[in-house]
Amino acid sequence: MDNCDFSGYATRNDLLCGDGVTIRKDAFKGNDGCEVPLVWNHEHNDPNAVLGHAVLENRDDGVYAYGVFNDTEQGQTAKKLVQNGDVRSLSIWANQLKKIGKDVVHGNIRELSLVLAGANPGAYVDFVMAHSAEGEEEMEVSWDENIMLYHSADTEKKGENKVAEETIKEVLD
């Protein structure tokens, strides 16, 4: 999409989300081409939390979003946060969900939020366009798989914190 301020995955398919659900392919295909509000942290009750809008594109691996910030103070602040890489995570709010077990197979995306940490590990900004006052445009492209760092202090030492491996039957007997 031309003239977007940023783009990235609103949600990715087949990844276990922090809320315990997994979004499956084409669950939101009905939103392909739709424009939804871009909101700060799912704040639905505050009009000042609306930062702009996003156009959604259904893809084989998820729903991609092209975001445009509005010219409000909040919209421009959010734009700077995204341009600086301070906020990179995206999150959807959807309703009319149909699930098979913990798999979301259908739904309707109502808004896209910029969040500090999203539930879907594949939902993040991967492209930022910077528009200059002279009319020139610059872009930053990144590929971020939200890498988890494990420090040596986090690893379990042999013999410490060993979890008992008893069956339920053994515990009840």
Functional labels for PLM-detected ranges:
Residues 2-8, 13-17, 35-37, 53-154:
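Residue microenvironments linked to proteolytic maturation
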Residues 19-47:
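Small/polar-rich, solvent-exposed N-terminal microdomains that initiate assembly or binding
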Residues 26, 73-76, 162, 166:
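Generic alpha-helical secondary structure signal
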Residues 43-44, 51-55:
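Polyanion/phosphate-binding surface patch
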Residues 46-49, 75:
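Short active-site-adjacent helix-start/loop capping segments
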Residues 159-173:
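Amphipathic alpha-helical oligomerization/scaffolding segments
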